[in-house]
Each structure stands twice: as structure tokens, then as C-alpha cells.
Amino acid sequence: MKVFAIQSSPNRDGLTSSLAQSVLKGVRAEGGTTELIHLNELNFKHCIACDNGWGICRTEGVCILEDDFESIREKMADCDAFVFTTPVYFGDLSESAKVFFDRLRRVEGGKDFGSFKGKKTIGIASAGGGGGGAVRALYALENYLRRLNFDVFDLVSVTKFSKDHKLEMLERAGRRLASE
């Protein structure tokens, strides 16, 4: 099984990244292959709502903006499962996660959202504070994942207070994901 993780925190070595790494460790323990990318290190532009707002992507199946988005989509096409991690900012996804999902939903909308149908996904929202907005952020992430037809394997909210036992749980989730 090949699992692709997309991490959307500007802190490559922080809590959000460690959560993705924990899932991927479990996947590798079961013989799976993994890749992790950090959205904030890539060149991403926001959707410009081209073609009178509907987007050329909906008819052409690709985004016309020249950045790293299409190369990520190509990598995603070859994967069996996904992990999406985002820090929680004011009860919502990170800015880079929102930009990524806004563009992905537009391109996939022209394909009747079929590219990811049945592909298992773990969504993780990590809050650096007490976690008051984590559930709202996780709800937003779930909304994107379900509308894009991912098969949501698990949704996990994590705070700085729950990280130790959640890291262990996420490694087990990665093992289970890879064994299905």
C-alpha cells in the first residue's frame, strides 16, 4: 500500500508534522510505502475563479495556474490512501490547507469527484492550545474529504495535552490502514 501524507503547518517539525509521521510509521511497519509533503514549502497560488468564476479546470480537468498543484495531484493519483494534517487556526484549517482543498474540489468537480472514490483517508486537526476549535476544524476537513469522495477511515483531533497517547493511537491507525 502506498500512503501519501499532506501536512499543512508552517512548522515542519512541530506537532502537526509529528502526527502525520506517526501514521506513516505504522504504515511502514506493515510493509507500506509512504511520502510526506509540506504544503507550506511548495509554490501554491489561490484559485482565481477563472472563466467567469466556474473555472476552466471544471471542463479541462487541470488547473491553469502554474505552480506545484498539478504535480501534487499527479502524485496523489498513484496512491492508495492519504493522511491530511492541519493545525487549527481560529477553529479552522490552516490557510495552506484551505487553498489546497479549494483548488482540489474545483478540479475534481469536473470529474464528478471520482478520482479519490474509495481511497481511505485519515484526517487530523492539531490544536496547539486547549483545543477549543479542533472539532470545528475537523468538521471542515471532513466536509472537504467527503465531498471529494474520499473514504474517511478516521478523523482525529489532537491537542498539546493529548498528543502523547494520540501519537501511539495514530501509529496503530497507520498499521490498520496499511493492512486493509
Predicted features, each with a name:
Residues 1-107, 152-180:
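N-terminal beta1-alpha1-beta2 submodule of the flavodoxin-like/Rossmannoid cofactor-binding fold
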Residues 95-96, 110-154:
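Short, glycine-/small-residue-rich phosphate/pyrophosphate-handling segment
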